[in-house]
Amino acid sequence: MDHGGAREWMVVDAAEHMEIGPALARKYDFLIIEDDPYYFLQFEKPWAPTFLSMDVDGRVIRTDSFSKILSSGLRIGFLTGPKPLIDRVILHIQVSTMHTSTFTQIMISQLLQQWGETGFLEHIDRVVEFYRTQRDAMLIAADKWLKDLAEWYPPAAGMFLWIKIKGVSDTQQLIMEKALQKEVLLVPGGAFNINSSEPSSYVRASFSLCSPAQMNLAFKRLADLIKEAL
């Protein structure tokens, strides 16, 4: 399960039906891989529950990432799960990629030891506040330029805004050709389908590093392109 922080579609599941996943895993004898790299970037507390927190018989393997909360260049994640399964993963890594960068592993290890749990959570709070400010700036720009052209929900976590373009059945050409010509970098929704060739009316916008002025200009240009396409 990887929802990229877009928990607006997960609210009901988190509140009422998250137990269904582990229950189905027990009933039909399968494992759950919970891919949740944006978990620590939730904008409200208490944080949403995880499948791992509900696991009672070792069926959940959870993946997290330091790349989203420390530095994107680190490219290091970590697994949490039952020891027999993690041991098999370790054996696989030893005969494939060997391991991630030793230097970056040492950096993270030393940093976490120096911070401790309290220091780590204080860092998370600062990161979340940064992304909350970025999200709010993007929502202002979206409301200004896309209000009558698209639909979206305020993201509850992460660094992306998931936008549905009204009247456009497939955003591939709009984003990968016309938007690029206007120096607007977005990702067409089809990239997130199981079959990426299937049409999608969605677009993903990142608010990780853009300034409010850049967001405003990008959505103005996107609005003009949408109007031309309709």
PLM features per residue range, with description:
Residues 1-230:
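PLP-dependent class I/II
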